[in-house]
Amino acid sequence: QATNVASALGADWLNDLGYFRTASGEIADVPVTASRVSYVGEAGWEISCQSRDAVRLYQALFRQGARPVGSLAVSAMRVEKGFMSYGHDIDTDTVPAEAGLDFTLDWSSDFIGKSALQMAAGSKPTKRIVSLVFDDEMVTPLGNEPVVGKGGLIGKTTSAAFGYRLGKPVALALIDAEYARDDEMVDIDLAGCHVAARVVTGPAFDPTGRRMRKAASA
């Protein structure tokens, strides 16, 4: 649908934009900058323009079929995709390896905290952020629920939502690394009731990222 909207507005250059690329152009005669990135795990763009042009751009997109969505929908989709939110899933105390973000470190450059990370580089993280999938469609995790393993408390959920693409509730959780294995079963304490969840070490939805990386015109 997004590609059809772009084409209808004479902005086919958006459809030619490669994944993780940024370009400037026009949509409905409005100068914009578009980035081919995704916070929800689908092919699309993040588009910015001058504030004075925002209403005109919005109206042009709306006339061609684009529809606004709420923040809860966006949050649910990013939890399905395993995208972490700063302040919810990660913060200044998070070690990059715990979040699977150590690949972003440039050891050839200097940065704040480098010496501390170098000292810890030889040891495996004691905690990991994972996805949790619930088979019970009726449970309603909200985040910050205790996660329980065979040995007792092993962590907590950090974000949660109903995953409409999966058809199941999903959550992100920071848990003891020994439980961070695909298909490991853990319990979530929901208001005193233990509910089973399955561990997924990557994104619960589209783990390869094919949907958001595919050619926008495909």
Feature map (PLM): residue ranges:
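Conserved, structured C-terminal
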Residues: 1-218
